[in-house]
Amino acid sequence: MELGLTGKRVLVTAASKGLGRAVAEALLAEGCRVCISSSSSDRINAAAREMASGGGEVHAIAADIAVAEDCARLFDWAVRTLGGLDILVNNTGGPPAGNVLEVNEAQWNHAFESILMSAVRLSRAAIPVMRQGGGGAIVNLASLAGKQPIDGIALSNAFRPALIGMAKTLSREAAPEVRVNNIATEHILTDRIRDIAGRIWRRDDESVEETIERKSREVPLGRYGTAQELANAVVFLCSDAASYITGVTLAVDGGLDRGLF
């Protein structure tokens, strides 16, 4: 299947590790020209060096996407560096685990800015540029928490649905030139999941690995997914193979979501 991604100009946020990095690496492997960002200069530059060592064009910048000025600076830099933009992948690290009564107001405000407003700002900036270049694709990395609350992650439960709702609305406004879709992930084994397993889900008599094994039995496919499997879904939604798909939220969760839609 021809994906039509060679030479596409890409920006992936929160890409120094975890899901964001896996997505950036997968798009790089398809021949895309990739810009990546993270709040940590050391981490994002190290990631760029490692990714570039395998071949391909990758550029890095430090930016805090929870800050409006950094979003603007990041976007302007990416467009200057690549000469335009064809694909935007909105990803956010975190937010911290915790229940509604535990999370403080500063954390609520930061999650609002980083999860929702970063995607709003970058998408609003990207669509005119993509239209000028003949079209494009935006993919937001959301969570199954956007469809059904998950114990212990109140911030995701609150703001991932808002992200999905914004993107669904935007998909109609941006059409036909720009497609906008979401990925709803859950039970993808990352450092964040290990942290949540250890601090929120673990029973007193369990190790973290035993907790992960127990939680994996909740998944119809019987295991946690990998970051690469998530990245494959993002690549598909960015590609010509998904040219008639917009406004969808694709669950990459091993069948964990019980919903009909």
Map each language-model feature to its residues.
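Active-site loop-to-helix junction immediately N-terminal to the catalytic Tyr of the SDR YXXXK motif
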Residues: 103, 149-157, 169
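Alpha-helical segment proximal to the catalytic Tyr-Lys
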Residues: 128, 172-176, 243
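Active-site helix of classical SDR
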Residues: 123, 159-160, 167
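Substrate-binding pocket helix/loop in short-chain dehydrogenase/reductase
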Residues: 71, 99-100, 104-112, 138, ...
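Residue(s) in the substrate-gating loop at a strand-loop-helix junction
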Residues: 143
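Short C-terminal tail/terminal secondary-structure segment
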Residues: 148, 235, 246-261
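Conserved glycine-rich cofactor-binding loop
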Residues: 9, 14-18
